[in-house]
Amino acid sequence: MEQVFKTELNGKEFSLRAGKIAKQASGSVIVQYGETIVLVTAVAAKEARDSVSFLPLTVEYQEKIYAAGRIPGNYFRREIGRPSEKETLTARLIDRPIRPLFEKGWASEIQVIATVISTDKENDPDVLALVGASAALQMSDIPFAGPIAGLRVGRIDGKFIANPTVQEMENSDIELVVAGSKTGVVMVEGGADVVSEADMLEAIFFGHQAMQPLIQLQEDLKKALGKEKRAYTPPLVDEELMAKVVELAQDKIHTAVQTQGKFERVKALDDVRTEVIETLGEAFADRINEIKSMFGDLVKKVSRKIVLTENQRIDGRAFDEVREITCEVGVLPRPHGSALFTRGETQVLGVLTLGSGPDEQRIETLNGNETRNFMLHYNFPPFSVGECRRAGGPSRRDVGHGNLAHRALARVLPDQADFEYTIRLVGEVMESNGSSSMGTVCAGTLALMDGGVPIAAPVSGIAMGLVSDADNTVVLTDILGDEDHFGDMDFKVAGTEQGITALQMDIKIRELPKAVLVKALDQARIGRLHILKRMLATLEIHRDKMSPYAPKIITVKINPDKIREIIGPGGKMIRSIQADTNTNIEVDDSGLIKIAAENQEDGEAAAKIVSDIGMDPEIGGIYEGEVVKTTDFGAFVRIKTGTDGLVHISELANHRVKKVTDVVKEGEVIRVKVLEITRDGKIRLSCKALEEEEK
């Protein structure tokens, strides 16, 4: 029997339905807002996996093209292949806030699948899927410390809006997805048109308040349809064995974790672990994995204690201190812009490539086909962390990090009308020890400036961390990879000197107090301004000239009625122009022609041909043209591509001409003046009139 639970959000009905569809799943919910509908299911395996050191959670988000009343445009006419970027990002958006809410030590596989089955093209299904994931877990038999909810926050004309439509978001200066529980925020992700920390905090707190009815809705759902949760007892810790590990390793770990240098620290800890295993291995030969797990837990505990009770960081920095920074620009000769940004043991090579319209990315989405003229790709090869493993395509993490850096920089790029290039940035992570995504933002900014892209303002980014217990809370600036591992928060903030352009916050604790959020943002502002100062010391403003290897783009405006002539029958004319001039030509219905060439000479040659075709001859106009044919009565002169006029023999010179070829020959280029254009389009030309005019 289906039951429906409803509330109102931003003047529209928001509903959860359960009990009718996908009843064999542990939890199944249909979320509807407007005419956008998402089915979300949650299932957990009955048996636990052996020796699992992480939560075996998988989140999938699928957008069915039929949801928009369309047939997929690929050859097979069905959804195939790897998930789209939007699907990958939304799966991460769901995964990150729910992951900390499962029982510690849970080892049975959990799978959450969100499927978009209807879309009205107004209400984005991603936040509906997030709410649905929590709701499905709430009503399932899977232990889950929810509920949480999520929604999008926009701001139009200074007014905050909860779950604005896709159309409303076009006029919003903030786009923020906030996830939270009844009492606190658990995840934040979004971008903004350079807004202050105070405005961003206000947006986050507005979102948290606005989502409360969605949390209540889930509580009502659980009360009515919730299944009894599985009995689960976290794995018991052998206190006697743990005591032996502590006795053997605690003091040595305390020294080892404070070893300077990432690999030196890793080696020092490996040496201690090896010693512990060798000492206990004979007596506990069948429990080596358990000893390794205990050792890892002890490393975290000792590292946290150093921060919380000894007021120190493991690398000796102050809590608000940024690692040493070096910046270089112009490090690669042929790409159109490049920069090497190094912060501590994190290093990113930023590479800029400029292209033209055909280089834009074309994407099939639920809302139709879209194009993107700015792309940012993030690569994290195994050598960047000293590992030897398969180097495949981009992972979910790579896509997510690239998207965050894209958000940070997209807000400062010039309008396409002012800068007609397609822009591709690549962040190649050369070394990583914390916050390579923010390193990509910094390297990307410098590469753009090195390439002469007129950005509105340079952007820098920083990652903040948190270590907290019942008594103490410490916010860390510019966290190491180890601090991310043993800490409670990863909070990335990017922006200009004036404000924030992007941020992303994930936590490992159940919720984040408001006071900590305020402190983290304020401390992040100080840190990223420090980084920005170091960047500007290398390159203060974008270069006034682009790379000589960047394509040249020339625009020509013609009469729209002439577009057919530019293209020619079956595209013959435009293909001929492109082949002859080694250019790429785009034709807009408005008559705007964009020509992309490898050099100025080719571009100008193509522009001249296009202008010639696109212009209408004018009476009295003077043109330079080629004699294409001579007859007894005159010469035909091509004054533009596809347009010939006749110079009668009497108009060839200001003296009597007996024979046309005595004055002009085929292939000769001459200057002529238009005397007349008849009703049927015939053009009378004259050389004599031009000679008389120039006397």
From Swiss-Prot:
UniProt keyword Nucleotide-binding present: no
Subcellular location: Cytoplasm
Predominant location category: cytoplasm
Signal sequence annotation: none
GO cellular component: cytosol
Record domain S1 motif: where: 620-688
Gene: pnp
Alphabetized SMART domains for the sequence: KH (SM00322), S1 (SM00316)
Annotated function: Involved in mRNA degradation. Catalyzes the phosphorolysis of single-stranded polyribonucleotides processively in the 3'- to 5'-direction.
Domain KH: 551-610
Keywords from the UniProt entry: Cytoplasm, Magnesium, Metal-binding, Nucleotidyltransferase, RNA-binding, Transferase
Alphabetized PROSITE patterns for the sequence: KH_TYPE_1, S1
Gene Ontology biological process: mRNA catabolic process; RNA processing
InterPro entries hit by this protein: ExoRNase_PH_dom1, ExoRNase_PH_dom2, ExoRNase_PH_dom2_sf, KH_dom, KH_dom_type_1, KH_dom_type_1_sf, NA-bd_OB-fold, PNPase
Binding site for Mg(2+): D484, D490
Protein name in the entry: Polyribonucleotide nucleotidyltransferase
Top-level class of the enzyme under EC nomenclature: transferase
Cofactor(s), by name: Mg(2+)
Protein family per UniProt: Belongs to the polyribonucleotide nucleotidyltransferase family.
